[in-house]
Amino acid sequence: MTHKPRVICLGVATLDQIFRVDTIPEAPAKFGALEFIVTGGGMAANAAVAVKRLGGEAQYWGRVGDDDVGDQILRQLEREGVDVSHVFRLPGARSKTSAILVDNRGERLICSAPAQGYPADTSWLPLGEVQHADAVHADSRWKPGAIALFDAAAAAAIPSVFDADAGDPEEVLTIAQRATHPVFSEPMLKSLGFGAPDVAIPRAFGGRNVICGVTLGERGTWWFDGERL
């Protein structure tokens, strides 16, 4: 029987309302959408869905309010086959939702209603499960959770992937160096103040890193392995 890699994904999950339009307006206006989709979103949640669609087994670990939006977020993940048994439902909290305009060139405009009532506490995380996983993934939206997960992954000697998309530069760099495979967005890497990507990636490399990468949109992806870029 073929082994299915098991990946734990920790971080944000949202409910995205996506409006496809010809162009994103630059001035106030009323206009109709070409298409409307309601779907799950959030970096960690989407990573879990990607793992499942690629043939792996995925668990999503994160915090969700006990509101209607939270119910919809979990239904979307369950429909994709993602294990949500370790999601922490927070009484009285507001789950995160976003309205997203996407034009015909693929450009986007996002307006998010942030989650409310999400404590930073990590004591509920079932970190003993990490030893049974093949890899872990975390985004930058819940930093204490990412640190706890990456430390558990290091103890279990398994790879850890960090989606370094946004946040305080010093905090994000600290977390990135606790992962084996951090990948920065280009704006996040720029915010570190290390210069152009080919200079910044080697400077960001450190700690537990096996590789350190950056996504550059249509220009592709660069990574540094400690010797070569």
Where are these predicted regions, by residue range?
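Thr-Gly-centered strand-to-loop micro-motif
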Residues: L34, G41, K96, A138-D139, ...
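Short Asp/Glu-rich motifs
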Residues: G70-D71, S95-T97, V172-L173
